[in-house]
Amino acid sequence: MSTTVRQFSSSTSLKGLGGGSSRLSCGRAAGYQAPSVHGGSSSYSVSSRIVSGLGAGYGGGYCSSVGGGLGGGFGASYGAGYGAGFGGGFGAGFGGGFGGGDGILPAGEKETMQNLNDRLAAYLDKVRALEEANTDLEVKIREWYKKQGPGPERDYSPYYRTIEELRSKILAATVENANIVLQIDNARLAADDFRTKFETEQALRLSVEADINGLRRVLDELTLSRADLEMQIENLKEELAYLKKNHEEEMNALRGQVGGEISVEMDAAPGIDLTKILAEMREQYESLAEKNRRDAEQWFFSKTEELNREVAVNTEQLQSGKTEITELRRTIQSLEIDLQSQLSTKAALEGTLADTEARYGTQLAQLQALITSVEEQLAELRCDMERQNHEYRVLLDVKCRLEQEIATYRRLLEGEDAHISSQYSSAMSSHSGRDAITTSRQVRTIVEEVQDGKVVSSREQMALTTR
């Protein structure tokens, strides 16, 4: 809080009716400082001068100037004349006061403010000139368009049909190319499938040939075994024939021996019946030969059946193995075809994935750039808003200060009007009463308490001295 003390002193001298002069001087000392826009401080002072005279009329003038570090100034002038009538005026302007007052700005700051005012005026003049030039150009453009008028439009309808035909041909060619590409891809896949089938069939053929070669070796072994068995059968037959022949020879020999013997009858114990013995021996040999034949036939048939069973079992196993191998090869072929199709699908999906990733990467980069630009614009807008808010607060502060100063000056002017009227009436009464020279001095002291740019309290003291 700061306290402002204003002191007004006035002196009056009166003479005769022929002429006279009255002087009122007012001095103000104010200690007030307020923060400026750039963090500094500004101060102001008020100086005023009133000159009045009596003669054919009474006139007075008042002028004051206010300047400050806020970048603006206030000036006012007041004048009154007595004769034809009484009138008053009040004016204000930025940049400094005019009249008989002393400015509160230093010489350098006054020149700076004047330069700024000149530059502002020149800028406004340029703006007006550019607006006028823009208006002239718009008028000229409208006139030119009016003079030119709408030209005759060409009829492009015949070309539209040609364009549609060409578009349809292009679309048909595109579809045909796509079909050809699809057929080429299908032919390539079919060729790959046929190549795979050929390789599979070739491998199957080689394996079948290998199996046939193995079966041929088995057949050769079986043929050799059969030949061996046939040779054994022949040997057994020869042995049987040889045994039969020996048996017949022995029988014939025994018969010859029996036929050539002399029969001698003796009265003795009965002898051995050789015929019976030979018959028994024949039966024994025949039974032995028959047994050997049956055994050989049984062994041959058993071996043959065993070999036939082995051949049948091996043939069944071979056939089942061939069937299983064929099914396995078909399964392998179908699995290879599925593998090729899956690999083709995988390659196509990988290509699509790469394209999609590239496309979305590009879109993401564009969105990121857009987000960055929007964030930059938002930051700039935020900075502009903060700057404008700061400027608004500063201007609002300046406006409040100027309104306070204007109110103060208005009170001062109202007080000066009252003083001038009282002095005029006292001068007229003094002139009518006596011609002696009377000097009076009136001291007016105003004490104001200002807190945060607002007047909290105001006190006024007046002192009058006459001599």
Swiss-Prot record:
Pfam hit, one: Filament
Domain of life according to the entry: Eukaryota
Linker 1: annotated span: 145-162
Region (Coil 1A): 109-144
SUPFAM superfamilies (UniProt xref): Intermediate filament protein, coiled coil region, Prefoldin
SMART domains tied to this protein: Filament
Gene3D superfamilies registered for this protein in UniProt: 1.20.5.170, Single helix bin (1.20.5.500), Vasodilator-stimulated phosphoprotein (1.20.5.1160)
Described function: The nonhelical tail domain is involved in promoting KRT5-KRT14 filaments to self-organize into large bundles and enhances the mechanical properties involved in resilience of keratin intermediate filaments in vitro.
Record protein name field: Keratin, type I cytoskeletal 14
Native source species: Gallus gallus
Species lineage: Eukaryota, Metazoa, Chordata, Craniata, Vertebrata
